[in-house]
């Protein structure tokens, strides 16, 4: 919730009154909170490879296991193990190293804090209050968020549609780049 408020405050400071909003993974949780708090400012919402539950059912490992792996194996090893689940081709994916490099930009404490925030968050009850036109994007090989998470979003957000990308994992935008970009632009540009 504090990240949601921080972003909303920044937008307010920059005098951005209305905007489209896309959230990927944990960012999807943040945009759900932003929409709950200031939905009138959001033109269209995109919930991408995310869900309404932080303790993600069907995730490749529990959040507690990720925290334990972080402590035992360190940030570098944990980041590698998690990032390889984000691609169908794992470590052989074209943009795998981009994710690893991004992971190097954080600290052990920040990584652990994000996992704690993940685990303790549940936005299911707030979904019915999201009235914004919403696109839900999910890859059929996603090991972080299963289909039930995407379906829960679709079922509980009244003005939503779900698009499933076949042959993609958690990072659809890095596996089917053109198709992903076209899908997002079409959603934003069409009434």
Predicted features along the sequence, with ranges:
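Active-site loop/oxyanion-hole signature of alpha/beta-hydrolase fold enzymes
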Residues: 1-22, 182
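Gly/Ala-rich beta-loop-alpha elbow adjacent to hydrolase catalytic centers
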Residues: 23, 27, 31
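Flexible "cap/lid" loop of the alpha/beta hydrolase fold
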Residues: 32-37, 42-73, 77
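Conserved alpha/beta-hydrolase catalytic His-Asp/Glu region
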Residues: 55-61, 72-128
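Short beta-strand/loop motif that positions the catalytic acidic residue
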Residues: 130, 136-138, 142
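Conserved alpha/beta-hydrolase "acid-adjacent" motif
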Residues: 143-149
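Active-site-adjacent alpha-helix of alpha/beta-hydrolase-fold enzymes
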Residues: 151-160
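Catalytic active-site module of serine/aspartate enzymes centered on a nucleophile-bearing elbow/loop
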Residues: 160-191
């Amino acid at each position: 919730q504090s990240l949601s408020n921080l972003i909303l405050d920044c937008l307010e400071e920059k005098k951005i009154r209305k905007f489209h909003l896309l959230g990927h993974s944990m960012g999807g949780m943040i945009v759900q909170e932003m929409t709950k708090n200031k939905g009138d400012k959001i033109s269209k919402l995109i919930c991408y490879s995310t869900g309404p539950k932080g303790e993600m059912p069907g995730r490749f490992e529990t959040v507690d296991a990720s925290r334990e792996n972080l402590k035992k194996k360190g940030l570098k090893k944990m980041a590698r193990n998690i990032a390889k689940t984000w691609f169908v081709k794992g470590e052989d994916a074209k943009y795998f190293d981009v994710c690893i490099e991004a992971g190097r930009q954080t600290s052990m404490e920040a990584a652990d804090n994000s996992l704690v925030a993940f685990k303790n968050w549940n936005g299911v009850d707030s979904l019915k209050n999201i009235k914004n036109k919403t696109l839900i994007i999910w890859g059929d090989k996603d090991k972080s968020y299963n289909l039930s998470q995407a379906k829960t979003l679709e079922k509980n957000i009244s003005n939503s549609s779900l698009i499933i990308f076949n042959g993609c994992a958690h990072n659809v935008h890095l596996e089917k780049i053109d198709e992903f970009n076209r899908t997002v632009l079409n959603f934003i540009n069409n009434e």
